[in-house]
Every structure is written in structure tokens, then in C-alpha cells.
């Protein structure tokens, strides 16, 4: 059986909040078996903890945010969540000095890099549990849709449709089969993106105050404003897959299924998760044997 994992040691990360523009400090700590993904706001006295699960998702406008029953929240969790999922980590305590996870360079790579090189991953003596999708689950909203079907792998077949010359000149669809190595090499470095006109509007409304070319792909009327250009020719759709991996893992579980979407986004991901977990006959818990294709991908 494949085993649960955590960090080998604690690590510190510094950055800035995308929307607040303020400095943020993270400490990622090892956690015992069956702890799950725990976020701990240490800027509040006493500290407030969130165990990541679908019921805590409260806001999916521009990012994914968690909020407890007392209204305490943590926002922009998706890129860190994707890094934790992508590295196969099951148990971790994330201490944070703000209400917002730092945006870093707009991808999961800074988190992946520091976890691998400054901590490493420790195997724990307890079987890892997965959620298997048993029946097709689909949600639609206007011309957008997303579905998941039963599979013995975690795959994402996503398409976007942006009517902008910069994005439409790139491939807007991508099929990805999850594995730790493929996540690191194909997905983790894909950055979030935004249009200059939207960033200016958001900043005028005191949002995206930390947004710039150091933490996102910024798109002008006819070109990308980042001097270094794109990291992948299809970086936009790859980042959409990164967001989905992070959002699905906010449920607290690795979900085994074939995901397919047209015009995905945080809200569509959340709608799908709600429908999955609302209908218990659509999924089941299971451990996996080492010869299972999904485990081999890990």
C-alpha cells in the first residue's frame, strides 16, 4: 500500500499578498498521520486553525478562500494547495501571519522548490486514502461546464476560450495525467495571468495591490508585458490545470477520476466539488496497492 507523507522538517517562506500587497510569512510544519492540511492563522490571538475541506470554501471570486463559522478567513490558497498535492503530501501544518497566502511568482514552483530543497518529504506508517469517483458528475453554468468520470488515474482535459490575440495565438487545450514528476515539470511553473486593464481596475478598488509582472503574466492589448515572455507556449491553460489541482485538493483528499472542462475556473471547480460531496453514492474512499496505475504515477 502507498503510505501517507509529511515534511521532514519545518521551513519558512516570505512573500507578499496578491490583493493586500502586504508582507506575509509562512511556516510549513510536519504533521502526524491523518492530520490533513491544516492552516493556522498566527496573527490572531489565540491562533485560529482550519482543516482544509470543501465545507470551508466560501469565496471563489478571483481566488479560492476558506472561512470558518466565525468569519475568519484565509484566501489565495490554491497555488500552495497545488504544490502540496503535487508533491504527494498528506499532512502539514501551515502557519501564516496574514489572511492571504503569498502569491510568490504566481505559480506553485517557489513552494515546490523550497519544500524539495529545504525540507524533503517523510513517509509515514499509515496507508494513504484516496477518493474514487464512481459515477459521472457534471455541472454547467452558461457556456461553461466541468465534469468528472470514473477512472483509475487522475487526469485533466481542459480547454479555455479567450477572445484575445495573445491567448488565442497559443494552444488553449491541454490533457494532463497526474504524477509527481509530471506536475513538477509540466504544471508547477505555470503562472497566473491577468489583463493590464483588469489589474488597473482592481487596484483602483484596493484589490490586486501586489499584482505586477513579478507575480503574474500581465497581458496588454497586443502583447505580454513580462520581459522574459512565457515559460511554456501554452502557459495559460497549464495554469488553469494548476488552479484545478489546488482547488480539488482543498477538499482535503486526492480525487481519482478523469476531469474534463470547458472554461474552467475557481467557481466551476467549487460547484463540482459541492455536487460530488453532496452525493455520497458518486464516490468512495479507498487505499491503493502499489501496482495501481495512479500510485505508479506518484
Curated annotation (Swiss-Prot):
Pathway(s) per entry: Glycolipid biosynthesis; lipid IV(A) biosynthesis; lipid IV(A) from (3R)-3-hydroxytetradecanoyl-[acyl-carrier-protein] and UDP-N-acetyl-alpha-D-glucosamine: step 2/6
Active-site feature positions: 266 (proton donor)
Signal peptide feature range: none
Highest taxon in the source lineage: Bacteria
Keywords, comma-separated and alphabetical: Hydrolase, Lipid A biosynthesis, Lipid biosynthesis, Lipid metabolism, Metal-binding, Zinc
Pfam families the UniProt entry points to: LpxC (PF03331)
Cellular component terms (Gene Ontology): membrane
Coiled-coil ranges from the UniProt annotation: none
Enzyme class: hydrolase
Gene3D superfamilies per UniProt: lpxc deacetylase, domain 1, lpxc deacetylase, domain 2
GO biological process, one term: lipid A biosynthetic process
Chain positions recorded as Zn(2+) binding sites: 79, 239, 243
GO molecular function, one term: UDP-3-O-acyl-N-acetylglucosamine deacetylase activity
Cofactor: Zn(2+)
Annotated EC: 3.5.1.108
Catalytic activity annotation: a UDP-3-O-[(3R)-3-hydroxyacyl]-N-acetyl-alpha-D-glucosamine + H2O = a UDP-3-O-[(3R)-3-hydroxyacyl]-alpha-D-glucosamine + acetate
Record-linked InterPro entries: Ribosomal_Su5_D2-typ_SF, UDP-acyl_GlcNac_deAcase, UDP-acyl_GlcNac_deAcase_C, UDP-acyl_N-AcGlcN_deAcase_N
Protein family: Belongs to the LpxC family.
PANTHER family: UDP-3-O-ACYL-N-ACETYLGLUCOSAMINE DEACETYLASE 1, MITOCHONDRIAL-RELATED
Function according to Swiss-Prot or TrEMBL: Catalyzes the hydrolysis of UDP-3-O-myristoyl-N-acetylglucosamine to form UDP-3-O-myristoylglucosamine and acetate, the committed step in lipid A biosynthesis.
Descriptive protein name: UDP-3-O-acyl-N-acetylglucosamine deacetylase
Organism: Wigglesworthia glossinidia brevipalpis
UniProt gene name: lpxC
Amino acid at each position: 500500500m502507498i503510505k501517507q507523507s509529511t515534511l521532514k522538517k519545518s521551513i519558512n517562506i516570505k512573500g507578499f499578498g496578491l490583493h493586500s500587497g502586504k508582507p506575509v510569512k509562512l511556516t510549513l510544519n510536519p504533521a502526524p498521520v491523518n492530520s490533513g492540511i491544516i492552516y493556522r492563522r498566527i496573527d490572531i490571538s489565540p491562533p485560529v486553525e482550519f482543516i482544509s475541506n470543501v465545507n470551508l470554501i466560501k469565496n471563489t471570486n478571483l481566488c479560492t478562500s476558506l472561512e470558518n463559522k466565525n468569519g475568519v478567513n484565509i484566501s489565495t490558497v490554491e497555488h500552495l494547495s497545488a504544490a502540496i498535492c503535487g508533491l504527494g503530501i498528506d499532512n502539514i501544518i501551515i502557519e501564516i501571519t496574514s489572511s492571504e497566502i503569498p502569491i510568490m511568482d504566481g505559480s506553485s514552483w517557489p513552494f515546490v522548490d523550497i519544500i524539495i530543497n529545504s525540507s524533503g518529504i517523510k513517509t509515514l506508517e499509515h496507508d494513504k486514502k484516496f477518493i474514487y469517483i464512481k459515477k459521472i458528475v457534471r455541472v454547467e453554468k452558461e457556456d461553461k461546464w466541468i465534469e468528472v468520470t470514473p477512472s483509475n488515474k487522475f487526469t485533466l482535459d481542459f480547454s479555455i476560450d479567450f477572445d484575445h490575440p495573445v491567448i488565442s495565438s497559443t494552444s488553449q487545450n491541454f490533457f494532463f495525467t497526474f504524477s509527481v514528476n509530471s506536475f513538477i515539470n509540466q504544471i508547477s511553473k505555470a503562472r497566473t495571468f491577468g489583463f493590464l486593464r483588469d489589474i488597473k481596475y482592481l487596484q483602483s478598488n484596493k484589490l490586486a495591490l501586489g499584482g505586477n509582472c513579478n507575480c503574474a503574466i500581465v497581458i496588454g492589448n497586443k502583447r505580454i508585458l513580462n520581459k522574459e515572455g512565457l515559460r511554456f507556449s501554452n502557459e495559460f491553460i497549464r495554469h488553469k490545470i494548476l488552479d484545478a489541482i489546488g482547488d480539488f485538493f482543498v477538499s482535503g483528499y486526492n480525487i481519482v477520476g478523469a476531469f474534463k472542462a470547458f472554461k474552467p475556473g475557481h467557481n466551476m471547480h467549487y460547484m463540482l466539488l459541492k455536487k460530488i460531496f453532496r452525493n455520497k453514492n458518486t464516490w468512495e474512499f479507498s487505499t491503493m496497492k502499489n501496482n495501481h496505475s495512479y500510485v505508479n504515477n506518484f
